[in-house]
A protein has these predicted regions:
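Short connector loops at secondary-structure junctions
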Residues: 32-44, 166-172
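Generic structural "secondary-structure junction" signal
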Residues: 8, 39-41, 105, 117-120, ...
Length: 242
C-alpha cells in the first residue's frame, strides 16, 4: 500500500524479501494502489497514489534488489481477477470479512461507513491466487488476510499458500501511546524512525526511546534483533575500559 515515507518497520519485510531472493525465490512485490485507494491512503488522490507506487518501487529496488513488481491496477485488469474476488467472498462470510478489516489498520465498524472496505480482505486473498504464489509474505498484521486465503482454499479447490509473517517493530514511544497496537507507525512521528531521517534526528529519537529493562516489549532491542542483525550480520560495540 502506498502510504508515504518509508519507516524502519517496513525494512523488516524488505530484508526478508532480500533473503528470499538470495535463497533462489522469485519474489514479486504487489504495489497495491487500489488497496491504498480503498484505505484512504494519501488523501485518496490518484496522483499521490501513483507517486507513492513509484516511490515504493524505488525503495524496494534499493533494499530488496532482484525483486519483481506488479501493481494492483495491472492485476485487477487481468481476466478472472474479479471472478476470484467473488469466489473468495462467496466462500466466506460478512462476519469474517468484518473481522479481517484489521489488516487495513481499521476498526470493524469502519466498513459500515464505506462499503468498499469490505472488498479489501477478499481482494487481498484473491491477490495471492491471481499472482499464483507459493508463499505469501507480510507483517504479522496481515495474518487475517493470509488465513482467509488458506481457509477458502478447500472450498475453492485451490492449493493453500504458505504464509510467512515478519515481526512488527514496536513504537519508540512505548505501549499505549499514539498507536493502539504499539507498533511503529507514521501516526506517531517521535516514535518512528524514517529512512530519510538525518543521523541527528535518529539519534534524538533513539535517545528518548522507551527502553525498559525487560526484553519483552523493548522497541530498541526489537530494532537490534529484527533489523540491524539481519542487515549487518555482525555488530561490534566498543566500550571504554573502567
Amino acid at each position: 500500500e502506498p502510504s508515504g515515507l518509508l519507516h524502519a518497520g517496513s525494512l523488516v519485510p524488505m530484508l526478508k524479501c532480500r533473503e528470499l531472493v538470495k535463497a533462489g525465490f522469485e519474489v514479486t512485490i504487489l504495489l497495491a494502489d487500489w488497496h491504498g485507494y480503498i484505505n484512504d491512503k494519501l488523501g485518496g488522490s490518484w496522483d499521490n497514489l501513483n507517486a507513492g507506487v513509484e516511490y515504493q518501487r524505488q525503495m524496494f529496488s534499493v533494499f530488496s534488489p532482484g525483486v519483481k513488481f506488479k501493481t494492483a491496477s495491472e492485476l485487477v485488469d487481468e481476466e478472472g481477477y474479479w471472478e476470484m474476488v467473488l469466489r473468495v467472498s462467496k466462500a466466506s462470510s460478512l462476519k469474517r470479512m468484518r473481522r479481517a478489516l484489521s489488516i487495513m489498520g481499521r476498526d470493524e465498524s469502519d466498513g459500515d461507513k464505506d462499503m468498499s472496505k469490505f472488498f479489501y480482505p477478499a481482494m487481498q486473498a484473491a491477490d495471492i491466487y491471481a499472482l499464483d504464489v507459493d508463499l505469501a509474505l507480510g507483517g504479522m498484521d496481515q495474518r487475517h488476510a493470509h488465513m482467509l486465503a488458506r481457509d477458502v482454499a478447500d472450498k475453492l479447490k485451490l492449493r493453500k499458500p504458505i504464509a510467512l509473517h515478519t515481526p512488527l517493530l514496536g513504537s519508540l514511544s512505548g505501549p499505549g501511546r499514539m498507536d493502539t497496537d504499539a507498533k511503529m507507525s507514521k501516526s506517531d512521528p517521535t516514535g518512528t524512525l524514517l529512512v530519510h531521517d538525518s543521523k541527528k534526528i535518529l539519534t534524538k529519537k533513539l535517545s528518548k526511546a522507551y527502553c525498559p529493562l525487560e526484553r519483552e516489549g523493548n522497541p530498541v532491542l526489537d530494532i537490534w534483533q529484527h533489523l540491524l542483525e539481519p542487515a549487518l550480520a555482525s555488530i561490534t560495540i566498543e566500550r571504554p575500559e573502567k
